[in-house]
Swiss-Prot record:
Main EC class the enzyme belongs to: ligase
Phosphoserine carried by residues: 415
Organism the protein comes from: Homo sapiens
Name of the featured protein: Glutathione synthetase
InterPro entries in the record: Glutathione_synthase (IPR005615), Glutathione_synthase_a-hlx (IPR014042), Glutathione_synthase_C_euk (IPR014709), Glutathione_synthase_N_euk (IPR014049), GSH-S_sub-bd_sf (IPR037013), GSH_synth_subst-bd (IPR004887), PreATP-grasp_dom_sf (IPR016185)
């Protein structure tokens, strides 16, 4: 895709002035992060990195991503309710991956005891890149679906005003008008509010499981503020707090500091290093409770890379979404090539193909949080080490998506504005709420565009690689 801002990107003096204005507007709008030096304090904050200009995104692909989001919501919900599918799919992974195994153990314990929760809440984000086809046209291909702690809905609600401001300064009012309104934080809060309401206890609270050091607190506060506007109170606690002050009554209702909890919203708990033994015990306590968890443990497992790979097998979508051929077709159209590395002929073939053409593949472990994937020579070395080991079952191979690079100017605290070749990743936020077996809400609630320099193979905004952006539909 050719850039709309080509000539503007060549004028260094104008770029520097625009960058100053854009940064001030970002700060005024609340596009904020705590600093890496003081991640526990809001005394000193900075702007979250962002692009100076919105990046061009084909309208048809944006519409396609929105159109398929409710199908992905249904699919994740269906997977989370299918214990046999999860067990079969993850059977080889849990033998080799301790983290997935610990999550799965909690899942099994809860199933054995009987699931106490009756209201289920999904806040997810499906991420895509635009694959360059043979004829040069871009195609929407899913990278992953995030089913736990899907972030940046709050900050993405505040960036459109920044890019409108930049274009207005340039007297491009018509172009400024094309930047889509976007308010994921409101939509995500609506889902939490619906789950809270269905829980049926007006004095109960929402519990946000937070990290001790949280730079991205303003993203979370945006959702908290939306809930408070509906008179729903949120308390922030760590896993350590829960192990000290959390308890269940005889009906398995959850209490923290003596206050009943209706909804547990996890913004922690998606990486192995976030769990001590004490934290695992706290997670089990939360999982056993009657409160609506976002996500419950089965939904977190539904978001693993291994599940993503198995869903791409012929017949899997039809089995999970019976009688919904249109939804199946929409979902399948977004799938990139995904390959099992389980021990056996199929896995051997996938490894051989990746070693023969490493530039065509990405090696993915069962990890969230960005910056975990292996490419190129790193991938080749890892595959050579793994190919004769059962440990390879804890990874999947994925076709490498090759988007068309474009120029934009990236703004980061402490760094000069720089024009670089970039690629973007589009995320669509989805919300669903289920009571027992009845789906009471299923919607898409906004988008997130993140852009990074092409020299960075992997990593998101939180990992310090990508920056916030907005789609400019073309």
């Amino acid at each position: 895709m050719a850039t709309n801002w080509g000539s503007l990107l060549q004028d260094k003096q104008q770029l520097e002035e625009l960058a100053r204005q854009a940064v001030d507007r970002a700060l005024a709008e609340g596009v904020l992060l705590r600093t890496s030096q003081e991640p526990t304090s809001s005394e000193v904050v900075s702007y979250a990195p962002f692009t100076l200009f919105p990046s061009l995104v084909p309208s048809a692909l944006l519409e396609q991503a929105y159109a398929v989001q409710m199908d992905f919501n249904l699919l994740v919900d269906a997977v989370s309710q299918n214990a046999a599918f999860l067990e079969q799919t993850l059977s080889s992974t849990i033998k080799q991956d301790d983290f997935t195994a610990r999550l799965f153990d909690i899942h099994k314990q809860v199933l054995k005891e009987g699931i106490a929760q009756t209201v289920f809440l999904g806040l997810n984000r499906s991420d895509y890149m635009f694959q360059r086809s043979a004829d040069g046209s871009p195609a929407l291909k899913q990278i992953e679906i995030n089913t736990i702690s899907a972030s940046f809905g709050g900050l993405a609600s505040r960036t459109p005003a920044v890019h409108r401001h930049v274009l207005s300064v340039l007297s491009k009012t018509k172009e400024a008008g094309k930047i889509l309104s976007n308010n994921p934080s409101k939509g995500l809060a609506l889902g939490i509010a619906k789950a809270w309401e269905l829980y049926g206890s007006p004095n109960a609270l929402v519990l946000l499981i937070a990290q001790e050091k949280e730079r991205n607190i303003f993203d979370q506060r945006a959702i908290e503020n939306e809930l408070l506007a509906r008179n729903i109170h949120v308390i922030r606690r760590t896993f350590e707090d829960i192990s000290e002050k959390g308890s269940l009554d005889q009906d398995r209702r959850l209490f923290v500091d003596g206050q009943e909890i209706a909804v547990v919203y996890f913004r922690d708990g998606y990486m192995p290093r976030q769990y001590s033994l004490q934290n695992w015990e706290a997670r089990l306590l939360l999982e056993r409770s009657h409160a609506a968890k976002c996500p419950d443990i089965a939904t977190q497992l539904a978001g693993t890379k291994k599940v993503q790979q198995e869903l791409s097998r012929p017949g899997m979508l039809e089995m999970l979404l019976p009688g919904q051929p249109e939804a199946v077709a929409r979902l399948r159209a977004t799938f990139a090539g995904l390959y099992s590395l389980d021990v056996g002929e199929e896995g051997d073939q996938a490894i051989a193909e990746a070693l023969a053409a490493p530039s065509r593949f990405v090696l993915k472990p069962q990890r969230e949080g960005g910056g975990n994937n292996l490419y190129g020579e790193e991938m080749v070395q890892a595959l050579k080490q793994l190919k004769d080991s059962e440990e390879r079952a804890s990874y999947i191979l994925m076709e490498k998506i090759e988007p068309e690079p474009f120029e934009n100017c990236l703004l980061r605290p402490g760094s000069p504005a720089r024009v670089v070749q970039c690629i973007s990743e589009l995320g669509i936020f989805g919300v669903y709420v289920r009571q027992e077996k009845t789906l009471v809400m299923n919607k898409h609630v906004g988008h997130l565009l993140r852009t990074k320099a092409i020299e960075h193979a992997d990593g998101g905004v939180a990992a310090g690689v990508a920056v916030l952006d907005n789609p400019y539909p073309v």
